[in-house]
Amino acid sequence: MSQIKNTQQNSYQGKALWRSLDEFADTAEFRALVEKEFPNHAPELFHSTSRRHFLKVMGASVALAGGLAGCRWPQQQILPHTSRPEGRSPGVPVSYASCWEQQEVAEGVLVTSYDGRPIRVDGNGDHPSHRGSTTAQMQASVLGMYDPGRSSQPSHVTADGHATADWNLAISALRTAGRSGKVAVLAAPSSSMALSAMRNRLLREVADSSWHEWAPLHRDSERLGTAQLFGRPMRPVADLSAAQVLVCLDADPLMNHPASLQHSSDWAALRTSADDDEPILSRVWSVESTLSVTGGVADVRIPARTADIPRIAAQLAAATGVQLPSDVAAAVASAPPSTDDRIQQMAADLKSHQGSCLLMAGDRQPAEVHALVHAMNIALGAVGKTLSYAEVAHGERPAHIDDLQRLADRIGQGEVETLLLIGVNPVYDAPAIGKSWKDLIGQVPHSMHLGLYDDETAGVCQWHLNQTHFLEEWGDGRSWDGTVTLRQPLIAPLYSGRSALEVISAVVD
């Protein structure tokens, strides 16, 4: 049709069409209804409109929308370079090596950049810890940089409430705090050696300063278990590619573990097909209270309560000839032994594969179970073959809950003048230590929060400082096996934020 006409107009040949009886009758009530629904365009519904006029209006609106969207393209502030590098073609994606850190473990990644803007995060195929594997969390990490809910500027408390501030004023406040002393830092745990060096400098140069760490999800029981056995915390590094028999006591190494990517790759390499010339049929035993990924692929899965795992571990230790530590012996003395025949079969399987077996305990188990599991690994000859140990960062650090208690005691005794919180939200996810963390932070004369979001903790601090995303900053970290990985920025900070290194540097300068 070249024209859209009212059904009452008969100036053209053809059958008149209508959508309802009211439209066909063209009553005053129908016209009033249309006027109410389309007040500015009601006359157009009853008069002919040419296709040319319709396309003209639509073309103008499309051009206007395209013009408005194109207004931002020439802005170059967020590009990491002022001029295009030689040999770089616009529109061709480029990948850069960097690292992404989660739960105090850095993973090597390849970040794809499109015309100076990072758009994708994948595993680095040249990194030895996971050989290019990736997780959903790793790939989704790029979305945090473009999150419109990110904090975009510093703010501080005034007589009228929270007001925006600039970084010059914030840096001045940080330097004043460093000169005054009595600075306490509560930070998220990190494997960064650069941040560790800055931490040591803060403790050395700022009078009466202290450093504390907190994370709601941690592996403190594993650290304490190795400390009980070896005298200092160690990090167990498993090699599932050499484990003919794997026993998981409430552990999920294929999913719920910082090194799950490497574990999955190693385990899959050992489970070769029976059609191969020399098939390898490794065996997995899983004792757990909740179905996990590892339990789902296990050859034998034994359901058990989490509270029963120490008793089962003690039975395995007795069957393999390992002496129980006094703490574990006291914990399981009153518990009756399991009557499940598969526990004895598991112990026999371990003894028949000495040097090619491995036991792992989950992070929900107490430190005594971890110590017992490592003692069994040593007795069964796993160390040096299916298991090794690496040094951990800040081995002298106490457990997270004990560190919170130490900080709360310092605040209560008036030993903290400035509290700097970096990448943590204790008001939301930390347990109360006598008082809520909202009240504890309120007792400190000066409180400053550095984070990606203006969250619950930022709301009770006197200062909130917007933090850079990991794609906007320099840094470093260590993978689970101790491999050092460097971080490089893919883009200039979108909101002129600062990293933890820059903020601590301002305090000690």
Region annotations inferred by a language model:
Residues M1-P337, Q344:
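N-terminal export/assembly segments and adjacent metallocofactor-ligating motifs
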Residues A165, L169, A177, D208, ...:
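Non-catalytic alpha/beta scaffold blocks inside enzyme catalytic domains
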